[in-house]
Amino acid sequence: MSNQLPTDYQAFIHKSRYAKYHEGQGRESWDDTVTRFSVNVIRDMVDPETKYQLEQAIMGLEVMPSMRSLMTAGAAAERDNTCMYNCSYLAVDDLKSFDEAMFILLCGTGVGFSVERQSISKLPEVPELFQSETNIVVKDSKEGWAKA
């Protein structure tokens, strides 16, 4: 395995976008990033020889997994693997669609949505504005903001 990427540009993109920072050690090398991906995503889903071949192919830039999975493999993806996806889709046909979209966006994943008549006709009408003294307390987390 090689710690070097072929060009300065590739090295910059790796260090600035995908390499985790480790206190006292600095940023990961390309090897470290691929190993983190392998340990956390590939795991033991394939036999050791296939796992080694996959690692070598990624290391040599012959194949590339989702860059979001390279970036988030580890603790972030263990908490919620939504962060590993580049994009998602949902039909806006229920009020919970808005909660789901907010949560997915807060995880860093894009959300495409449908507002076709057959979907949005299932939503309740929005009431007229009215004065209220109600205070809403929002838990400062992805889940809290999505439910607010």
How would you name each of these model-derived features?
Residues M1-A148:
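Extended catalytic cores of very large enzyme megasubunits
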